Amino acid sequence: MIAHKQKKTKKKRAWASGQLSTDITTSEMGLKSLSSNSIFDPDYIKELVNDIRKFSHMLLYLKEAIFSDCFKEVIHIRLEELLRVLKSIMNKHQNLNSVDLQNAAEMLTAKVKAVNFTEVNEENKNDLFQEVFSSIETLAFTFGNILTNFLMGDVGNDSLLRLPVSRETKSFENVSVESVDSSSEKGNFSPLELDNVLLKNTDSIELALSYAKTWSKYTKNIVSWVEKKLNLELESTRNMVKLAEATRTNIGIQEFMPLQSLFTNALLNDIESSHLLQQTIAALQANKFVQPLLGRKNEMEKQRKEIKELWKQEQNKMLEAENALKKAKLLCMQRQDEYEKAKSSMFRAEEEHLSSSGGLAKNLNKQLEKKRRLEEEALQKVEEANELYKVCVTNVEERRNDLENTKREILAQLRTLVFQCDLTLKAVTVNLFHMQHLQAASLADSLQSLCDSAKLYDPGQEYSEFVKATNSTEEEKVDGNVNKHLNSSQPSGFGPANSLEDVVRLPDSSNKIEEDRCSNSADITGPSFIRSWTFGMFSDSESTGGSSESRSLDSESISPGDFHRKLPRTPSSGTMSSADDLDEREPPSPSETGPNSLGTFKKTLMSKAALTHKFRKLRSPTKCRDCEGIVVFQGVECEECLLVCHRKCLENLVIICGHQKLPGKIHLFGAEFTQVAKKEPDGIPFILKICASEIENRALCLQGIYRVCGNKIKTEKLCQALENGMHLVDISEFSSHDICDVLKLYLRQLPEPFILFRLYKEFIDLAKEIQHVNEEQETKKNSLEDKKWPNMCIEINRILLKSKDLLRQLPASNFNSLHFLIVHLKRVVDHAEENKMNSKNLGVIFGPSLIRPRPTTAPITISSLAEYSNQARLVEFLITYSQKIFDGSLQPQDVMCSIGVVDQGCFPKPLLSPEERDIERSMKSLFFSSKEDIHTSESESKIFERATSFEESERKQNALGKCDACLSDKAQLLLDQEAESASQKIEDGKTPKPLSLKSDRSTNNVERHTPRTKIRPVSLPVDRLLLASPPNERNGRNMGNVNLDKFCKNPAFEGVNRKDAATTVCSKFNGFDQQTLQKIQDKQYEQNSLTAKTTMIMPSALQEKGVTTSLQISGDHSINATQPSKPYAEPVRSVREASERRSSDSYPLAPVRAPRTLQPQHWTTFYKPHAPIISIRGNEEKPASPSAAVPPGTDHDPHGLVVKSMPDPDKASACPGQATGQPKEDSEELGLPDVNPMCQRPRLKRMQQFEDLEGEIPQFV
């Protein structure tokens, strides 16, 4: 029986290579001769054979690990298992213990550890492991020799060297064998043995796949448990931190309390441990437990599905091969039967042929040949069927082998995958319990230290200190401390109330918010016991343990000496206080609005906003302001603002107490803009203010602001809170992205955007012009034609003016809101390097919300989609040039300004610095520039290069444009120098005589005029015209006493209603040096510089009634000029007008001329040669007296100005009937001819002829 087993073992291990297999086979063969020997027990031989087989397997596993490119750890594990098996054999079979065997094992261990696995690759693998392979062969050869000698009896038992194998054996000193128990002794299998065991099972793949699926479900449950547990712990830590902070604040202000420092330390330990636990939870949720395990589970699921699909494919192939084999076998049997039938038929035919004779022989021969042919065909078919059957058998065998190999590979892959998953699970489990152990150990240590400290406290110690402090004899020191403490503690107030009142601040106070929040600390330094105990007496509820509902244990002012407290106010009705009772009460003190008013709600978690209320129990059902559910039970009500909510909603309440009745819910999102704007004094919705303010406080540098979406649930909650609480909502608890979403949602849901539907086409046309200018800039950016760059600047200025004109047509509330939003977005763009949001990105986001067409039912077309880019481009332009477009303050909605009433905000401008003076010159030169055609020279382009910059410092931000210098030339610069030098002489030498401006009419207050029936001309905005009216530095020297009754507020800066209020304008005419101007004009004529045509449309108030003014000029000389009610224009050269605005030492004043009302035809020109006498056209034309117009001792100025009027071309073209339907009595009363409105004059070809004239300097009148 033993011999039979040995033969079977020899056949099974015949594939093993090397000397080891040969030696083992020889030794096993030697067992035959020793089987009959009585000294060898059969059980002992069987055990010896099993040990030898196990040692052989270990050697083969080590070789396979080296050949299969395994990791260093795997090879070391295989070596460790080999040495462990060898050691067990030597301990069990002492006859095999030999020095040679131990030396061979030691050599193998040294060779394996000497290999540098980082340098191993496919090329040098054989060279690096050559010595390892030789060591393995040496160990196998030595073991085989010893075993052969022992079994063959060549060496006696006594001759064998029996060395005890101790733990200090050098062969095993570096391998941790003792700590690893034998896997075979425990019943465990090696990886290959696991695969071999599963291979014997027909359903091995299904079993392994089911185990992998079960592992995934198991891991999913573990991860779910850990995540839920961590979330609960995280929520608990947050609540613990809130509770500890509140308690620490409350006990911090109370002096001489027993174990106060101990409990403070305990609270600090709770806060610190909570923070550490939060960090631990975050780490476990990230890369310490949840994420690695989920990643491994997902990988397991993915590979399991792939393996399952592969196994199905292999099974299908095997099934197809077996079906083909069955079909081939049936076909072969069928062909064999057919062949047998043909053969038997052939045999009968031959017998008939032999028995036949005569004439039948021929027929029988034919039949015989036929049947022989059939027999041959049947035989051929049989052979073909047999060949097909053999092929199918071969195919089935190949498929079966492939299936076995695939099965083996799949089992190995699944085993590796399961081992990896187990390794990951082990690692993350170790992390989980290790981190929890560290957390618990630190908490245990801190609790032990607190316990030891509490044992050292002496009862009554703090009370003794309190008595000593109160009976102190140093009264002056105490009084000083009292005053010092009161002054220092008074501004601090109560933290929650002060920290929440900053919510509704405007952006200008945003810099103080963080300082205010930081100053609301509850820790009070100095002798605070004076405040807590000296003033006031013990209350009944606190000293005698009165009502537990009247005061809260969490209150800041629970101390008996809280002198800020007042007696609780009870409602007059006995059940609930009415709104009238609340309105008649005096404002609450800070102590009443703090957390000391919680009463019975001391155990309820409250938000910061909830702490500002003074709650009481609700006694009648109503609606909750937080969740909008019906409150029946567990409801609370604020005694001051009557806010009602569930007790559970106090933790998330965001509405602050306003100390007066809270208004009802408003319809904010999707409501008409005017309904919200009319409730604000400046017309800007409160939601726009508080959202922009909060974003500017803490999110200007947040990356992706206004682009990243927020939490939908929190956004809806904030929208609901804003409708319920309006400006009393504390939005600091919400994230910045949620606030941005609310702001965008409000703008998107407006029925009509800030830019009205009726102005949509004009703004889209403006956006197209902006696109055209941008394209020209891109094309000419790299060109060498620098002369065209000033023209680009002129185009930009023209677009700026047009945009200002269009924006002034918006209602005051729309304009102010758009101004506020654009300025806010400009601040966001200023931090584009941090938040990655430039003006283009914001234009794409806010474009469709700020300007959109009137909604229609028409289908969406490509052209309508293309308008989105125009909307975004317009908003981008407004943001980029916001400082130039919105150069004034906001417009109040209702401000009265009547003729003759002195406005408080209309005072003369202060003296300007040289830089501001240059800016104002450039700005004013732009007001009188032409919008139609402006030619510039090379000198102008050079000045433009020095002066144009759209990104200058903020001190020049009120200037209309930084490229206004392109409208001035060298003549202006020279005139500036001489005019300033002349002005300096006047200031040094003498004081100019005052110029008084008086009115012939009384300056009594008048009521507001009837609303206008005609639209104001929009060729230039009103604020541009009025900016030139008030006296400034240059004309202030020549105007001493100015009647401010003639000046009115600037609508852009002081908020004059453009539709309802009439305005009074004072025009100024300054003198100039005749000789200086002549030089300038000669130089200007040589350069053929600027030829500009301007038209200044005066305000509408002068179109309805005249204003008579009187100028007293340096003595008794005066001129009375009556301004007609008809509109008049003032065409003038922009360069000369700019020069005449500067004062001169020769002629400090210029003559004032009445306006000319007779308008020329649109095909004529305003050109007029020099005239020695300047006429004033009033009731009739007559020469003006030089003595009346010019001061004594001065010559006549041939370059005077004539003020004229030109109707608005838009009004003339749009409403011709209205213009011509005016009654003629007004003009007849003033003696003025009836003149039809003149249309806007296009540029004529004849103008070029006048520009080319060289005989004389052109003069426009």
From Swiss-Prot:
A zinc finger (Phorbol-ester/DAG-type) spans 612-657. Residues 541-559 have a biased composition (Low complexity). InterPro entries: AH/BAR_dom_sf (IPR027267), C1-like_sf (IPR046349), F_BAR (IPR031160), GMIP/FCHO2-like_FCH (IPR054713), PE/DAG-bd (IPR002219), RHG29_45_N (IPR057028), Rho_GTPase_activation_prot (IPR008936), RhoGAP (IPR051025). Residues 671-886 form the Rho-GAP domain. GO terms for cellular component: cytoplasm; cytosol; protein-containing complex. The keyword Ubl conjugation does not apply. GO terms for biological process: negative regulation of small GTPase mediated signal transduction; regulation of small GTPase mediated signal transduction; Rho protein signal transduction. Residues 481-501, 541-600, 981-1011, 1117-1153, 1178-1238 are annotated as: Disordered. Residues 998-1010, 1133-1144 have a biased composition (Basic and acidic residues). Keywords: Coiled coil, GTPase activation, Metal-binding, Phosphoprotein, Zinc, Zinc-finger. Residues 192-462 form the F-BAR domain. One of its GO terms (molecular function) is zinc ion binding. Residues 1258-1261 are annotated as: Interaction with PTPN13/PTPL1. The modification Phosphoserine is found at residues 171, 176, 179, 190, 499, 519, 552, 913, 949, 1019, 1144, 1146. Residues 296-418 form a coiled coil. Widely expressed. Highly expressed in skeletal muscle and heart. Expressed at intermediate level in placenta, liver and pancreas. Weakly expressed in brain, lung and kidney. Pfam families: C1_1 (PF00130), GMIP-like_FCH (PF22699), RHG29_45_N (PF24235), RhoGAP (PF00620). The record marks 707 as: Arginine finger. GTPase activator for the Rho-type GTPases by converting them to an inactive GDP-bound state. Has strong activity toward RHOA, and weaker activity toward RAC1 and CDC42. May act as a specific effector of RAP2A to regulate Rho. In concert with RASIP1, suppresses RhoA signaling and dampens ROCK and MYH9 activities in endothelial cells and plays an essential role in blood vessel tubulogenesis. Interacts with PTPN13/PTPL1. Interacts with RAP2A via its coiled coil domain. Interacts with RASIP1. This is Rho GTPase-activating protein 29. It comes from Homo sapiens (Human). The lineage of its organism: Eukaryota, Metazoa, Chordata, Craniata, Vertebrata.
